[in-house]
Design a protein with these regions (language model features):
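Aromatic "clamp/platform" in nucleotide-sugar-dependent glycosyltransferases that forms part
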Residues: 220
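Active-site proximal beta-strand in glycosyltransferases
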Residues: 3-4, 61-64, 73-92, 113
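Short alpha-helical segment that forms part of, or immediately flanks, the ligand-binding pocket
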Residues: 206, 229-233, 247-248
């Protein structure tokens, strides 16, 4: 089977550092190739070039991994589906400019691979996409890439591994002495003199994530965060907000969910 995967066209695939969507696309490509499929990654930032590359490859199936490209759906002459990684999909009040993309989904009504049941409901209720076009397909992770040890170097320390930005709101938790941060900084409120480990390369991530006790992710919006799957692959517990609990078995002792109303108490 020939499969085209359309990426954002913003960063290289595979990424060298941060880039969850790019990592997912690369892992998906590798998994499908191992299964014997032929995969072409289209990762350019020009709509006409995207269509041209898809047509040149003549795939059996096309998977769009970037919301901004949903407008191309009707111009793709092969079976196609979209996946949105927008962190605020379940928080309509946080859409802001995304409302234009949501309206495009509502008008086109494409096939969608939803990252969770909650996101599927958003497409059904808010965008009036028929259930027959919606499929729940959570993110996966390449477990074989991660080092996993029984005795971590820093068992009493937790790591907040994510792009440091407004949605992740790392700056709110810098008073916690046992919480360390890794990621590129895109939020001027974050003090890089406090427990900042820099931006990790993929190689460093795969080797060293296992040496922390827990992963912390306290965003005010998430879809299905890949970093939680990476934490499990490396043997960590996770601490998330209610926005980051999609597809998690919250009855497990190594999963802690903090309600949004208690974020200020941390």
């Amino acid at each position: 089977m020939k499969i085209s995967i359309i990426g954002p066209g913003i960063m290289p695939i595979p990424p060298t550092g941060w880039g969850a969507v790019e990592t997912l696309i690369w892992d998906m490509r590798n998994a499908l190739t191992t299964l014997g499929h032929e995969v072409d990654i289209v990762n350019v930032n020009y709509p006409r070039k995207i269509i041209q590359k898809v047509n040149e490859f003549r795939p059996d199936f096309v998977h769009i991994h970037y919301d901004d490209w949903v407008g191309l759906y009707n111009y793709i002459q092969y079976p196609c589906a979209c996946t949105s990684h927008f962190g605020y999909l379940e928080r309509e009040e946080m859409f802001n400019g995304y409302v234009n993309i949501a309206n495009a989904f509502a008008q086109i009504k494409p096939r969608v691979f939803c990252l969770s049941e909650g996101i599927k409901k958003v497409y059904q209720v808010l965008m009036d996409i028929p259930e027959s076009n919606l499929y729940v397909s959570p993110n996966g992770v390449d477990c074989g890439s991660f080092n996993c040890v029984d005795t971590p170097d820093y068992p009493n320390a937790s790591i907040y591994l994510a792009k440091i930005d407004y949605r992740k709101r790392q700056h709110l938790f810098q008073s916690i002495p046992s919480l360390w941060y890794a990621g590129n900084i895109a939020d001027e409120r974050f003090d890089k003199t406090k427990n900042y480990l820099g931006e990790w390369s993929k190689k460093h991530l795969y080797k060293n994530l296992t040496h922390y006790g827990n992963l912390v992710l306290l965003s005010d919006g998430e879809a299905h965060p890949l970093v939680c799957m990476e934490a499990f692959a490396a043997g960590l517990g996770v601490v998330v907000t209610e926005w980051g609990k999609a597809n998690l078995d919250t009855n497990k002792k190594f999963i802690t969910v903090i309600p949004e109303k208690h974020i200020g108490d941390i």
